[in-house]
Curated annotation (Swiss-Prot):
TM stretches of this protein: 2-22
Principal location class: virion
Compartment(s) where it occurs, according to its Swiss-Prot or TrEMBL record: Virion membrane
Oligomer and partners: Component of the entry fusion complex (EFC) composed of OPG053, OPG076, OPG086, OPG094, OPG095, OPG099, OPG107, OPG143, OPG104, OPG147 and OPG155. Except for OPG095 and OPG053, each of the EFC proteins is required for assembly or stability of the complex.
Organism: Variola virus (isolate Human/India/Ind3/1967) (VARV)
Role of this protein: Component of the entry fusion complex (EFC), which consists of 11 proteins. During cell infection, this complex mediates entry of the virion core into the host cytoplasm by a two-step mechanism consisting of lipid mixing of the viral and cellular membranes and subsequent pore formation.
UniProt record, GO biological process: symbiont entry into host cell
Keywords attached to this entry: Late protein, Membrane, Transmembrane, Transmembrane helix, Viral envelope protein, Viral penetration into host cytoplasm, Virion, Virus entry into host cell
PTM comment: Unglycosylated because produced in viral factories instead of the classic ER -Golgi route.
GO cellular component terms, A-Z: membrane; viral envelope; virion membrane
Induction: Expressed in the intermediate phase of the viral replicative cycle.
Family: Belongs to the orthopoxvirus OPG076 family.
Name listed for the protein in its UniProt record: Entry-fusion complex protein OPG076
Virion surface side: 23-40
Classification lineage: Viruses, Varidnaviria, Bamfordvirae, Nucleocytoviricota, Pokkesviricetes
Length: 40
């Protein structure tokens, strides 16, 4: 039972970490796309 809880916590932590890493990359990508569209 404890192993399942630990696995769930690790999975949630990894998903949160990947989300926090990918969110600024996605936002800057969208920003650059809109900026290029605005320039052209």
């Amino acid at each position: 039972m404890l192993v399942v809880i630990m696995f769930f916590i690790a999975f949630a932590f990894c998903s949160w970490l990947s989300y926090s890493y990918l969110r600024p990359y996605i936002s800057t990508k969208e920003l650059n796309k809109s900026r290029m569209f605005y320039i052209t």
